[in-house]
Amino acid sequence: MTAAVVQADQRDLVRADIQGVVGGSYWHTTESLRTVEGTSKTRELLDYLGEPTGTEAYLIAHERRVAPGDTDGEGARAGCLHSLLTHVNSAASPTGPVELFVLERRLTARMANNDARTKARLLADGRITPGTRLYQTSPNDEQLLWLPDLVCSAYRHQITGRTPDLFPRISAMCTVLP
């Protein structure tokens, strides 16, 4: 699971720039990496994201082991979400505390409720601030959701060795969380 932190005054610019690279308002990294042209666009987007003058920050919560009984991966997701929310909502966040988290819409209400329960537990434990909000939407409606998808795919390809030149393009901007 990956978070991309984009400052409020940069969001419109970043949206316009990534749509310009893609040439439209639709992007899916996994789908794009299946073609030569899509892989080229992926590299171009990652080069944009990795630009050293940018203010974006990318955080990766890497759950190394999915428990044997976690057949749907929801436990691992909750662990990753816990790591991201507590880090990005704290003073340790590279851009200062963040309270609005925009997530890709989950497939089912049950899955969305699992995320809400994770947030509620963190709030009850005092791990996140009361103003913390989760908002779920589609990457078709919020192009900034392309960023965590790109970063996560690049990181995964680094681990698997499938396309090892992707992650180095953004690695300086990334923090891998436990």
Predicted feature locations:
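Phosphate-ester processing/binding pockets and catalytic centers
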Residues: 1-178
